[in-house]
Amino acid sequence: MNSASISRLTSVIRTTSVRGFHDRSSVPRVVDDREKSSAKYNDAGYTFRYHQQGVDPLPRIPDCKVPVARPNYKVRDQWNDEAARFGQNDYIDLLGDGSVHPAQLQYHTPTWLRGFPGQHKANELIKLIHYRNLYDSKLKQNSPKRWHELRKRIKYLMMQHNYNKQDEIGRERNLGLWEEEPDYTYKDKSRRSFRDEIH
């Protein structure tokens, strides 16, 4: 090869290598390539001085003959008599003859939340309307700011449900929250309704 072809070859190699450093191109790329080009390696040549979980092998002393300490293997029978019968009599005579509702035994919960359906059934709007109906007069008198914030939140959620989530309100009507059933002090079904007026 003559010197002209060699110099041309070196210039081509130089330009292609310089192009390799740039990740912008006038040629449109596929989406995957663009996402990869945006993720830059900023730790090239860096030596980590700590153990990387899942990357580095576990730290071991070289040429150490002492085995790694681990608990002795136990053969566990998951169907032994004690494990198989665990909790089988928990329900016997706990609630008596069935006249006491289980929600009335939830002494650790606030009175207005006892027996109330969870967020997966009755949403925040239903919960706040229930809370407002029970403590409306007390909140007005003792903490007007909290009462005002509660009304604002109910008003916002009511707008949200009326305009964006009408199907959810329909589902909640079928939960039995508004039906006339035997009441258990923790719910006031007669005063709670989705038609409640918001002032």
From Swiss-Prot:
Statement: the UniProt record of this protein carries the keyword Nuclease: no
Listed GO CC annotations: mitochondrial large ribosomal subunit
Keywords: Mitochondrion, Ribonucleoprotein, Ribosomal protein, Transit peptide
Pfam families according to UniProt: MRP-L51
Transit peptide start-stop: 1-15
GO biological process assignments: translation
Main location: mitochondrion
Gene Ontology molecular function: structural constituent of ribosome
Subcellular location: Mitochondrion
Zinc-finger is among the record's keywords: no
Quaternary structure (record): Component of the mitochondrial ribosome large subunit (39S) which comprises a 16S rRNA and about 50 distinct proteins.
Sequence similarity: Belongs to the mitochondrion-specific ribosomal protein mL51 family.
Protein name: Large ribosomal subunit protein mL51
Protein's organism: Caenorhabditis briggsae
Gene: mrpl-51
